[in-house]
């Protein structure tokens, strides 16, 4: 996770030094597409039939793509605003198996979305810094003798840069973190399956670095 954070800071610093022109044209509705290097960390515990509690932490990294649609103000003043919606298609699945197939389960997270607002500080007519606050969601699907814990909900905080590239294009770099609400799943109690007194809880967190290319209409 420390290596990912170091890489994210380096990416943002490099793009923050980029120069371009015609930033005064960069305002209005935009569309962008990009990719992120993402690290996922999950703290959780397992409470079994005997009341024994096991705690643990797992982590994983991935590269994912996304697209976004939004609106930003121009750089005619020293401050501005960026409003938008991000969609991250795809899915990630975790499987848990045992000697008894009746207790095998899988947990899938897919199609992440985010609504965000980002106040901007316009450093020059070509570049801006911003702080972003977002509301994030993701679909959750489970299979096996376990109840669905419900979809993931969380909040995102990030900082980044916007640098114009020609009259209608721009490059966005961003580093941020998302904290999701705690989720909890219990067994269904099917005969030979997972008992209703078995509970698993987890608190997912992500850290990411993003590069995106956008087009202002």
Give the location of each predicted region:
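Cleavable N-terminal export/targeting peptides
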Residues: 1-28
């Amino acid at each position: 996770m420390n290596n990912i954070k170091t890489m994210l800071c380096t990416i943002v610093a490099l793009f923050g030094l980029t120069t371009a022109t015609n930033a005064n044209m960069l305002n209005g509705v935009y569309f962008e597409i990009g990719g992120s290097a993402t690290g996922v960390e999950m703290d959780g515990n397992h409470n079994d039939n005997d009341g024994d509690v096991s705690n643990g932490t797992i982590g994983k990294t991935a590269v994912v793509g996304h697209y976004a649609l939004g609106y930003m103000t121009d750089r005619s003043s020293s401050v501005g605003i960026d409003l938008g919606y991000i969609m991250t298609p795809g899915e990630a699945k975790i499987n848990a198996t045992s000697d008894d197939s009746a207790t095998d389960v899988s947990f899938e997270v897919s199609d992440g979305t985010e609504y965000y607002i980002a106040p901007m500080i316009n450093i020059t007519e070509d570049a801006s810094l911003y702080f972003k606050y977002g509301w994030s969601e993701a679909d959750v699907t489970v299979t096996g003798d376990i109840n669905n814990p419900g979809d993931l909900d969380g909040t995102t905080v990030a900082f980044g840069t916007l640098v114009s590239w020609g009259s209608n294009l721009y490059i966005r770099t961003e580093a941020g973190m998302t904290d999701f609400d705690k989720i909890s799943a219990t067994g269904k109690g099917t005969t030979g399956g997972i008992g209703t007194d078995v509970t698993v809880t987890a608190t997912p967190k992500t850290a990411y670095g993003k590069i995106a290319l956008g087009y202002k209409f």
